């Protein structure tokens, strides 16, 4: 029995040993197969790209296998794989998105470069436009530095004149010598010297031009001093020019333009004289009436007002200075705010009163006063309150005040203004005197249209004909 027990124990130990060996062999086989599979997969695998996917080496189709983005736990974890067709669709879409992004980036770069070029063009155009406006403004301010050919051939409203009626130095009535003649000769000599000295340095040219300008300023100041010190002799020199300017002012539209150019061309010589300055202001007023451009109207009115102010600085005893200063205040007020218009209206009345006090026989001053009174009498309640708040003394006038001023102008010079007769008829009608209104309406119809105000009141005249019909 003991021998049988020992034999059974030995067999059990042998079976246990064989089982253990078989288990170890099976585990080694599994490990070897898995290691070989891993090696084959490692050889066929490419490096992951920026999107975190790899390509297989299948020769039939290039299929992308999605991988997990590397994280803190390493690269071991793999997303649950999609079906092969699903992976292809997803990756095709990703490829399309990438292609679209590249194309979009290229278009953005092209658009950015084109915008830079467009911005440069816009800046260049704006700069050139501003420089051109500055040159036009300088030409308008200082037309006497322009060459003779510019004044007769320019299409600008500032220098429109017919070639047949152009006034040159040789054709001037009094034989006076204008500043343009001297300036033209100096410019011609400057051009000849510049043509002969092309090798001169830029600095030398600048110094030469500066010296030339200094000489011109000294010559102008010397001429002005000579005119002031000359007394009667200076008046004799400028008198033909002033008479010619007055004659052109009384003429047609072309004559007024020529008168404006004539005065501008002689400002350098006679710009220190009061009788010259108020005529220049009057010429600016004429140009303000003639032009249709709103910005040009305002520019003419502003420049003319400055000339009238310069004339008043020479002395306060000239009725014409006050008169044309008032006119230009009214013209400039048409382009200003209501506050500035009210202030300009007060200044208008003040200077018209001074003009009447200095020259009580001037029908134009009474006409302007009548028109001011008529407009003030028709101010709205809000406008009157605004005027009262802005001014120490409120504006006040009646239709009767306007009528008396218009009648005074007609008394001093019958038929002075068609617009004046229309205003008289309107005043009489508003005062309930229809027979007088009808009479003055007929008198107004007898006069031709001379000014733009006459044309503007034509509609009022037609309405009066209908209202006052017998």
UniProtKB/Swiss-Prot annotation:
Motif annotated as FFAT, chain positions: 157-163
Listed transmembrane segments: 13-35
Segments on the Cytoplasmic face: 36-470
Pfam families (alphabetical): RMD1-3
Gene3D superfamilies cross-referenced by the UniProt entry: Tetratricopeptide repeat domain (1.25.40.10)
Post-translational modification: Phosphorylation at Thr-160 of the FFAT motif activates interaction with MOSPD2, VAPA and VAPB.
Localization per record: Mitochondrion outer membrane; Cytoplasm; Nucleus; Cytoplasm, Cytoskeleton, Spindle
Stretches of the chain found on the membrane's Mitochondrial intermembrane side: 1-12
GO-annotated molecular function: microtubule binding
Organism: Pongo abelii
Biased composition (Low complexity): 220-231
An annotated GO BP: cell differentiation
Acidic residues compositional bias, start-end: 191-201
Encoding gene (name): RMDN3
Region named Disordered: 167-231
Chief subcellular location: mitochondrion
UniProt keyword annotations, A-Z: Apoptosis, Coiled coil, Cytoplasm, Cytoskeleton, Differentiation, Membrane, Microtubule, Mitochondrion, Mitochondrion outer membrane, Nucleus, Phosphoprotein, Transmembrane, Transmembrane helix
Name the UniProt record assigns to this protein: Regulator of microtubule dynamics protein 3
